[in-house]
């Protein structure tokens, strides 16, 4: 039995890793301008090709951003589901992404109005502040309501309030600011630069490493707070760490790509079904890979389905993610009845 489980884990990770590699190649090659794998290999080898700028300045940064931010989004969802013991918790569902978007929009409008360039770090800091504000309200509501559905409804209401404030900000922004805000607030991986990719890679890699080393206390926490305390886990410190780390991940995603729906909720469940295990030591890296696969696939469809018109990434993630959430809710209700 133990041997068959190990084989399943190996197959699952191989499948996810190969899927990432295949989708990276597809995202780089497929588009309005077709680029062959031979041209990509030649360009990596230092040879000049016709579409070198499209490859290195547009498609590669965008593909890397989808890979990194997709993984971060799924990981943030997994941390929130673990924290709240709620299978449909996620940055978008709980309004955390909307809070990050609200403060990010306020900072963008204010700084651009003063003709000040908005740096990646500034936008991440602003989005983190917004994420923490929304998280604070969600935590406050979680103390008041014991029902899982009510917590989700509270998060959705917080999200609507934050979105309303964001729309108000956009209404009173000037034309140049509106274009930037509108594209960003819809959710998209377009317009990424290598500077953006480097900043997000550093922030998310550090966060991922910290989360990975928390796998053991998280495993104990999943079995109940009393058990975790008996195992020597500092529950208060663990909760604070989960709040901060999930907020950092959410802030980084919103700062660069805007709010993206359903990835954080759907991917952890799909990955758990693939692995046949909920162990954090497996779920943490698998969620990251799964989120990368999901966002790379959805971004490819968003770019190419109605080319040259591009869909927002949230439109595509909702199509594939929402049915998973419905499946989780139906399964939970059946388990309660049984």
Where are the predicted features?
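Alpha-helical transmembrane segments in inner-membrane proteins
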Residues: 1-338
């Amino acid at each position: 039995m133990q041997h068959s489980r190990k084989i399943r884990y190996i197959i699952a990770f191989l499948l996810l890793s190969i899927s990432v590699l295949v989708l990276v190649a597809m995202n780089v090659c497929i588009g309005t301008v077709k680029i062959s794998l031979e041209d990509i290999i030649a360009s990596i080898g230092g040879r000049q090709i016709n579409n070198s700028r499209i490859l290195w300045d547009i498609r590669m940064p965008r593909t890397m951003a989808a890979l990194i931010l997709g993984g971060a989004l799924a990981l943030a969802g997994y941390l929130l589901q673990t924290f709240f013991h709620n299978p449909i918790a996620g940055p978008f569902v709980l309004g955390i992404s909307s809070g990050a978007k609200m403060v990010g929009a306020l900072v963008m409008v204010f700084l651009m109005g003063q003709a000040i360039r908005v740096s990646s770090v500034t936008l991440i800091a602003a989005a983190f502040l917004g994420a923490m504000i929304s998280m604070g309200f969600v935590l406050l509501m979680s103390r008041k309501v014991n029902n899982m559905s009510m917590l989700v409804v509270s998060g959705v209401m917080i999200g609507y309030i934050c979105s309303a404030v964001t729309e108000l900000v956009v209404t009173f922004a000037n034309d140049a600011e509106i274009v930037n805000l509108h594209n960003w607030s819809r959710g998209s991986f377009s317009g990424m630069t290598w500077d953006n990719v480097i900043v997000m890679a550093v922030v998310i890699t550090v966060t991922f490493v910290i989360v990975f080393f928390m796998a053991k206390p998280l495993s104990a926490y999943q079995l109940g707070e009393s058990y975790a305390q008996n195992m020597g886990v500092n529950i208060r410190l663990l909760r604070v760490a989960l709040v901060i780390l999930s907020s950092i991940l959410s802030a980084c995603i919103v700062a660069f790509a805007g709010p993206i729906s359903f990835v954080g909720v759907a991917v952890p469940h799909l990955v758990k079904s693939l692995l046949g295990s909920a162990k954090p030591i497996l779920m943490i890296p698998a969620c990251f890979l799964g989120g990368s696969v999901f966002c790379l696939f959805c971004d490819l469809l968003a770019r190419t389905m109605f080319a040259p018109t591009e869909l927002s990434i949230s439109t595509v993630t909702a199509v594939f993610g929402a049915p998973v959430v419905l499946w989780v809710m139906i399964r939970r209700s059946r388990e309660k009845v049984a």
